[in-house]
C-alpha cells in the first residue's frame, strides 16, 4: 500500500466466486519493522474478514532478491485456525529504477517467481498480494507480462494472486503504468486503492475518500475492462485532521 503510515486497510468485494460464499473481506495487516507478533491473529476472529494480507516480503534489488521481513508459519497457522486465508503482500518497495531493471531481466523475473513459489510452500500460504507501485509507464507492458508469469507459475500451486492498483488518473508512475484490462485477465482479484483523494501533502484540505470520488473511481476502473467479479474495493481506515493557517494547510493522520 502506498503510504506506510496506514496501519490498516479494509478491502471488500461482493462476488459470486469469493471464497464460494459471495462476500470477501480482506484486511491488510501492516507490520512495523521489528514487530514480532501481529495483533490481527490474536484474540477472536474479526467479523466479516476472510483474508489477512501481512506485509512480509520486499523485492529489494534488480537481481530479484526478496527480503523476508516478517514471514511466520506460526502466524499462518493461527490465522488458518481462526478461519482466515493468508495472502502475503510482496512489494517492489516503490522503487521505479530498480523495478525497470528487474523487468528488463528475464533471469531476475524468474528468480522472483522461484522465491515466491518456495515462500508459498514454506509458509503454507493461500496466495500473494502484489503491491507493485511507482513504476515507469514505459514499463507498462513488461509489468503486465511479469504479473502474468507470476500468476501462471503460482496458480500451479493453487495460490490466489491479487494486485493493488490505483484509481485511473493522469499520473504516469502511479496510474498509467497499469494495463488494467490485461492485468485483470491474469489475476484472481484486483484491489482498487480508493485513497487518497487528498493526500498529506495536498495544498487544500479535503476527504481521504469521499463517496462521489470513490464511486467515480470504481466506474472508471470498470470502464477500463476490469470485471466486477474481480474488483475489490480498498477503503482507508484512517482520516486526516486538517489545520488551516494563513491560507496554508497541514494534515495530521489519525488511524
Positions of the model-derived regions?
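Hydrophobic faces of well-ordered beta-strands that scaffold small-molecule active sites
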Residues: 23-29, 50-54, 86-90, 128-130, ...
Amino acid at each position: 500500500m502506498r503510504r506506510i503510515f496506514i496501519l490498516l486497510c479494509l478491502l471488500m468485494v461482493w462476488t459470486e466466486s469469493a471464497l464460494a460464499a459471495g462476500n470477501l473481506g480482506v484486511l491488510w495487516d501492516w507490520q512495523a519493522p521489528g514487530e514480532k507478533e501481529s495483533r490481527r491473529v490474536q484474540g477472536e476472529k474479526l467479523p466479516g474478514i476472510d483474508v489477512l494480507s501481512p506485509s512480509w516480503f520486499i523485492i529489494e534489488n534488480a537481481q530479484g532478491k526478496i527480503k523476508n521481513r516478517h514471514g511466520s508459519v506460526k502466524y499462518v497457522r493461527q490465522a488458518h485456525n481462526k478461519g482466515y486465508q493468508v495472502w502475503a503482500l510482496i512489494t517492489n518497495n516503490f522503487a521505479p529504477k530498480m523495478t525497470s531493471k528487474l523487468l528488463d531481466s528475464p533471469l531476475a523475473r524468474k528468480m522472483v517467481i522461484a522465491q515466491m513459489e518456495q515462500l508459498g510452500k514454506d509458509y503454507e500460504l493461500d496466495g500473494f498480494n502484489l503491491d507493485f507501485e511507482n513504476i515507469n509507464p514505459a514499463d507498462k507492458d513488461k509489468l503486465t507480462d511479469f504479473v502474468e508469469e507470476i500468476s501462471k507459475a503460482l496458480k500451479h500451486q493453487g495460490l490466489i494472486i491479487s494486485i493493488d492498483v490505483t484509481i485511473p488518473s493522469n499520473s504516469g508512475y502511479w496510474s498509467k503504468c497499469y494495463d488494467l484490462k490485461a492485468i485483470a485477465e491474469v489475476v484472481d482479484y484486483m484491489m482498487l486503492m480508493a485513497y487518497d483523494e487528498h493526500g498529506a501533502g495536498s495544498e487544500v484540505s479535503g476527504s481521504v475518500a469521499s463517496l462521489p470520488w470513490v464511486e467515480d473511481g470504481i466506474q472508471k476502473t470498470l470502464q477500463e475492462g476490469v470485471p466486477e467479479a474481480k474488483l475489490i474495493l480498498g477503503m482507508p481506515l484512517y482520516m486526516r485532521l486538517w489545520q488551516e493557517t494563513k491560507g496554508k494547510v497541514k494534515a495530521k493522520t489519525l488511524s
